[in-house]
């Protein structure tokens, strides 16, 4: 039904704001980044406890802007920490909502609110509910899962939604299919994901929320275990985990995660700010080199995306350090809202069948590792 106009509402919760957008087919009718009072958010002990507050903010925004979602065709929420899943668009059901709320994927992240908010709005306005490429998309190759401790496996935690969409759009830009290219794709923002994509599968990458890879404006990044243990003597486990996702990186060095503020310090001649900034980009480049090895050096392009690319020197430094690996192509900003709406539209038009959440992780250990193997 190509002539039918489908209305699609998209919800993308972030740490201090919620991005909302309404699409009519491919046309974006509006998009808004609704910021939340930080003092209000600090009152909530858990991410899930924010749900009523964020629902109220969304409803107030819709009312204030005279936006009526009655008859909406689809509501799409950013996917969170259910059990690990294959890449794709999922029709949201009660099981997926419950497992996300319970954080079965062991990631306490604000993205867990996406499908919960969408499901709540569905009760009021109807329509179908979807989620696309959640943070727990798991396509890791076997070698990427193994650690130096038996029974402890690396997990796939990345900005899968933006990484996958940017990779697909870049392949189209090259006149090729994503499934026939080898790419290193980097999401560079408050969190940083550096990932290896082999023929359409994201086979390796740093677990940014778990403390792997480069430090970021909010995350401490990878550190020697001995240093972490020494630091733990002065911190509780909860406080240390908080450094992994919120209180590390720029927040630790400067007392702010605001990259614009740190950049202003550099422009004013702050040598320490420049040192830390350059070290972050240096670590991104190191991670890109690691992903090149994952792909045997057979890399078609290095693709950059994310909000921090508004600072041109980040792209320039990556070109200088990593350009010998493959061409570097940048897509500043993010494509998450467009990805969610566009893929839902394909489902509504009958061009794509949604996946259904099974309630089981897509990978559940090595058979050869089990005691009776």
Predicted segment positions?
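Short glycine-rich, Thr/Ser-proximal phosphate-binding strand/loop in the N-terminal lobe
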Residues: 8-49
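Phosphate/pyrophosphate-binding loops at sites that engage ATP/ADP/AMP, CoA/4′-phosphopantetheine
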Residues: 60-73, 173-177, 288-300
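Short beta-strand-loop/turn "lid" adjacent to the catalytic site in phosphate-handling enzymes
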Residues: 62-110, 128, 136-148
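Glycine-rich phosphate-binding loop plus the immediately following alpha-helix
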Residues: 112-119, 131, 146, 151-182, ...
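Adenine-nucleotide phosphate-binding core of ATP-dependent small-molecule kinases
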Residues: 242-297
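Glycine-rich phosphate-binding loops at beta-strand->alpha-helix junctions
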Residues: 299-318
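Conserved phosphate-binding/catalytic loops in two-lobed NTP-binding clefts
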Residues: 312, 316-342
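Structural signal for terminal/edge beta-strands and the immediately following C-terminal loop/tail
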Residues: 332-373
């Amino acid at each position: 039904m190509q002539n039918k106009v489908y209305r699609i509402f998209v919800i993308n919760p972030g740490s201090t704001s919620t991005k909302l957008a309404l699409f009519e087919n491919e046309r974006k009718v509006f998009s808004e980044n609704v910021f939340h009072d930080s003092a209000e958010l600090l009152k909530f002990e858990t991410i899930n406890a924010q749900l009523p507050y964020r629902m109220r903010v969304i409803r107030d925004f819709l009312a204030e802007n005279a936006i009526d979602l009655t008859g909406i065709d689809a509501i799409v929420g950013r996917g969170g920490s259910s059990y690990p899943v294959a890449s794709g668009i999922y029709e949201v059901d009660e099981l997926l909502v419950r497992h996300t709320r319970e954080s079965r994927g062991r990631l306490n992240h604000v993205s867990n609110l996406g499908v919960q908010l969408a499901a709540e709005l569905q009760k009021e306005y109807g329509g179908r509910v979807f989620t696309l490429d959640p943070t727990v998309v798991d396509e890791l190759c076997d070698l990427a899962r193994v650690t130096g401790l038996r029974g402890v496996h690396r997990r796939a935690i990345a900005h899968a939604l933006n990484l996958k969409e940017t990779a697909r759009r870049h392949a189209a830009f090259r006149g090729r299919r994503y499934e026939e290219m080898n790419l290193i794709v980097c999401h560079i923002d408050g969190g940083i994901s550096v990932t290896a994509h082999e023929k359409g599968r994201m086979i390796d990458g740093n677990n940014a929320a778990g403390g792997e890879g480069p430090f970021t404006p909010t995350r401490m990044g990878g550190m020697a275990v001995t240093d972490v243990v020494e630091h733990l003597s002065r911190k509780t486990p909860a406080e240390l985990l908080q450094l992994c996702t919120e209180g590390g990186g720029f927040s630790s060095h400067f007392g702010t995660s605001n990259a614009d503020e740190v950049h202003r310090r550099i422009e004013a001649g702050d040598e320490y700010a420049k040192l830390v900034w350059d070290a972050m980009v240096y670590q991104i480049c190191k991670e890109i080199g690691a992903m090149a090895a994952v792909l045997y050096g057979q890399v078609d392009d290095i693709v950059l995306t994310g909000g921090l690319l508004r600072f041109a020197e980040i792209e320039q430094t990556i070109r200088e350090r990593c350009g010998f690996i493959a061409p570097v192509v940048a897509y500043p900003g993010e494509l998450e809202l467009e990805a969610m709406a566009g893929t839902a539209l394909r489902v509504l038009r009958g061009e794509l069948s949604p996946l259904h959440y099974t309630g089981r992780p897509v990978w559940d250990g090595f058979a050869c590792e089990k005691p009776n193997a």
